[in-house]
Amino acid sequence: MAGVLVIGVAVVDFVFAVDTLPSQPTKYRAQTAEIVGGGCAANAAVAIARLGGRAVLGARLGDDAIGEMIVEDLGREGVDCALVQRTSGARSSFSSVYVDNAGERQIMNFRGQGLTSETAWIAQAPRMGAVLADTRWSEGAKRALALAAEWGVPGVVDAEAPMDPAALVGAS
């Protein structure tokens, strides 16, 4: 199976179910809470793996506890994390997500700190049958989509706003 190279963001989401979304500078109590994997690319890679496909994820993480949680969770889901870049001293991305009784949500995201901006490592990916890139890391998306064009395989963009329109150039 050729599989899919997925390039982009991987995070941990701390999800809190609340009666109403926070609106005042005070403490709120959650009805329930859970810690789940998140991020456009990571979610796509998990979906591919759960459907029986091969997913190789290229994402940028710190060498911190959050990064370790992300890699362990993705590994349990069957995602190949060999391309995940762990930067010494960097901090991985995570979010607090509040979901009210109507299903509306608020997300507070920490995008990470000190993560590598280098994209050359993406070219070390094994040849795959398709490439999916999210726009939360536009430089990585551009590099991954160029690789898809080089391989002659579909390049798909998960274009979550805000995005750099230049990332769409390599999509097919």
What are these regions (language model features)?
Residues 60, 93-98:
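Catalytic-core segment of enzymes that process non-peptidic bonds
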Residues 40-43, 66, 91-92, 140-143:
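Short glycine/serine/threonine-rich phosphate/pyrophosphate-binding segments
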Residues 67-68, 92-94, 166-168:
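Short Asp/Glu-rich motifs
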Residues 1-10, 56, 72-86, 98-172:
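Ribokinase/PfkB-type carbohydrate-kinase core domain
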Residues 63, 89, 163:
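Positions that flank functional sites
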Residues 51, 77, 90-93:
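Short, basic and Ser/Thr-rich N-terminal targeting/leader segments
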Residues 33-37, 88, 140:
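Residues at the start of alpha-helices and the adjacent loop-to-helix junctions
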Residues 1-60, 65-68:
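Glycine-rich phosphate/adenosyl-contacting loop at the front of the ribokinase-like
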